[in-house]
Amino acid sequence: MADWQVIEGNITAPKGFKAAGITAGLKPSGSPDLSLIYSETEAIAAGVFTTSQVRAACVDYCRQRLQAKASARAILVNSGQANAGTGKQGWDDAVESAQLLAQGLNISPESILLASTGVIGQRIKMEQLRQGITPLIQSLAPNGGDKAARAIMTTDLVPKTIALETEIDGRPVRMGGIAKGSGMIHPNMATMLAFVTCDAAVSTALWQQMLSRATQKTFNQVTVDGDTSTNDSLFALANGESRTAAITEMGPNAEKLEAMLTAVCQHLAKAIARDGEGATCLMEIQVTGAPDDQSARAVARTIAGSSLVKSAVFGRDPNWGRIAGAAGRAGVKFDQNNLLIKLGNYVLMDQGQPLEFDRPGASNYLKQAASGAYLEQDTVLIQVDLGTGSGQGTAWGCDLSYDYVRINADYTT
């Protein structure tokens, strides 16, 4: 049983956080496009970023900021222009964005983190951003998390939010999160934009370690289309407003906090896969019997990212051969004669041998998952046991539909 409970809210559920989201005119659609997360006190900040060699200005800016000072008061997010591949002017725009917000909040620019999402190669519409800063700050509210979550969306169909609460030393500690991501999602860092807030007190180094480990198990295990973005960023702020004793080393309290952080990240990661562009269902790949956990995660990622597996799921075809083929090319050694593959409750292969199974029933299982979009029953569970060791790992993805091609043919990225 989990040591925490789900509560109402999102990034503003922890004490001392406010948020806002407005329409500043950055998007041609007129949808909300400027978001702000704000801590009333200086918060410990941790970050994980894209591994792409082509990076947005905000990524390089925040890397430098966190290396110099692992704390922050505010996160400014613009949606509509990625500000990636924009050269020196893109960098200057990022710097100016931080300075404008700092001036409006009356805090240091060094206390501001930035994130951008949208079309690669397009600079931020700075005139609209300049005009939007004041109303954005004026919109800050303790219940502004929902608006902030909507203002970071691009091709997303739904906002992605969560809030959890636990007890540490007899005092309530809360953690909240929001994320965006629907396309250009592939496990190679944080795979999208995600923001986590917490009111626990924790040391800088430990908070970064916790976030990095949580990312490996969650966001790095998500794939929608095999493309890694130029802008992937994950930030976690912990402001200590719960007034619990500072957590400075691993122990029961640290383990509880890290487990809750991992749960928040996993929820957001699954929400991203569930909302994959054109997706009709979520795929969860559970791999056991691997040489070690890292190997298990690699096999799970490969299966989740296989276009053939994803297409079979969309076609409601219980094609175990595609699952076996993907497992075999994951770069992990195992004896194929030990392979077990299950689709839901249907055993398709055991001891490396294909089995007779209820094919119409298995196909109907896939159809039912597609009809339960955005519900708990929308998950297609694929279980693979390599029969080699005790390693285990999970990855998440989605099916590949005709709509994915249509969306990305029509949408400039």
Curated annotation (Swiss-Prot):
GO terms for molecular function: glutamate N-acetyltransferase activity; L-glutamate N-acetyltransferase activity. Its main location: cytoplasm. GO terms for biological process: L-arginine biosynthetic process; ornithine biosynthetic process. Substrate binds at T154, K180, T191, E277, N408, T413. Pathway: Amino-acid biosynthesis; L-arginine biosynthesis; L-ornithine and N-acetyl-L-glutamate from L-glutamate and N(2)-acetyl-L-ornithine (cyclic): step 1/1; Amino-acid biosynthesis; L-arginine biosynthesis; N(2)-acetyl-L-ornithine from L-glutamate: step 1/4. The keyword tRNA-binding does not apply. Its EC number is 2.3.1.35, 2.3.1.1. Keywords: Acyltransferase, Amino-acid biosynthesis, Arginine biosynthesis, Autocatalytic cleavage, Cytoplasm, Multifunctional enzyme, Transferase. The record marks T117, G118 as: Involved in the stabilization of negative charge on the oxyanion by the formation of the oxyanion hole. Belongs to the ArgJ family. NCBIfam families: ArgJ (TIGR00120), PRK05388.1 (NF003802). Heterotetramer of two alpha and two beta chains. This is Arginine biosynthesis bifunctional protein ArgJ. It comes from Synechocystis sp. (strain ATCC 27184 / PCC 6803 / Kazusa).
